[in-house]
């Protein structure tokens, strides 16, 4: 039951053409009807979200996003801004930490209180020589960077929630990477997880128990259904929503659905 989760919502996290602001507004209204409370802006093909994350969003976009935030307030749905800097990130670069915080703050100024840092779909090892010299592995670097960003942002703005997507976001929870993330990450940061697979046919209760134990916090699920990007682009996923254990709210904090490009 979705109502059992503290965080209930939608992550616009697919590859392909992003929704328009009008489509997002319709999504917010539908989310309110379904008693959802969080929408996350994270379209992979928005260059300023991912590949050009250091570039500020133009004023016109921020003004349109402010209208979306206000629309969300009317319907009881928080609108979160996610950034995905991992493809070009130097984890130990204080200038890049500052750049990311500044970009978040540009949305804090228009009323955003929920923020996300996504480090998914990037290499599993450190790519920059300076990071290889400064950190023992990817997990240590990500813990350092994420904690720095969160603590600076928290000191400068009103943060209700901060969600982190790890580079290993599905499968085996008994890994050294997740162990380091769990022990080192600030306890107030939420961690995202897609389940046994990237697109999980089923999400059993045991999965939630295991990954929440590994990460030392109740996980927030990023459920890649009914998303139909990539090799699934020719498909429409309109079948019944099944295979999710009804006990999941007992071992996880939230559930975000990654929808189809054609969702509305």
Segments (PLM) and residue ranges:
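Hydrophobic "anchor" residues on beta-strands that sit immediately upstream
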Residues: 116
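Feature activates predominantly on carbohydrate-active enzymes
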Residues: 1-105, 109-113, 154
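Short, histidine-centered active-site or binding-site loop motifs used for metal coordination
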Residues: 83-85, 121, 225
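Catalytic-core regions of glycoside hydrolase
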Residues: 13-14, 113, 125-264
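Short, conserved phosphate-binding/catalytic loop or strand-edge motifs used
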Residues: 47, 119-125
